From Swiss-Prot:
Positions bound to Zn(2+): C34, H38, C56, C59
Protein name: RNA polymerase-binding protein RbpA
Gene: rbpA
Result of changing C59A: Colonies remain small
Role according to the record: Binds to RNA polymerase (RNAP), stimulating transcription from principal, but not alternative sigma factor promoters. Stimulates transcription from several principal sigma factor HrdB (SigA)-dependent promoters but not from a SigR-dependent promoter. Stimulation occurs in the presence of the transcription initiation inhibitor rifampicin (Rif).
Length: 124
């Protein structure tokens, strides 16, 4: 198998066509700068939406757009609690009814609940 493999990978990668007569898409160079002072340019299409931040090519930190608005602050949603999810499914009146039903079952002794779970086991 190794004898039949092509020996030059450049044959596949290199295009021998010329760029003459080909109109490239219009581009714009956008400059970014990171906290460490690295500045670099990225080419974007004229029609593309320019991202406000980009990963620095040198150090990998977040670089911000030079002469541009900073990234938009995302509004953080308040965390949904168990109570919030419960209130989405039931009204307060329904919860009161369920509570009364469960308390009535407990008071009637219909549920066999051991005070200490260890007491309900058989001793050896």
């Amino acid at each position: 198998m190794s004898e039949r493999a092509l020996r030059g990978t450049r044959l596949v990668v290199t295009s021998y066509e010329t760029d003459r007569g080909i109109d490239l898409a219009p581009r714009q160079a956008v400059e970014y700068a990171c906290e460490k002072g690295h500045r670099f340019e990225m080419p974007f299409s004229v029609e593309a939406e320019i991202p406000p931040e980009w990963e620095c090519k040198v150090c990998g930190a977040q670089a911000l757009l030079v002469d541009g608005d900073g990234p938009e602050e995302k509004k953080a949603k308040p965390a949904r609690t168990h109570w919030d999810m419960l209130m989405e499914r039931r009204t307060r009146e329904e919860l009161e009814e369920v509570l009364e039903e469960r308390l009535a079952v407990l008071r009637s002794g219909a549920m066999n609940i051991a005070v200490h779970p260890r007491d309900s086991r058989k001793s050896a």
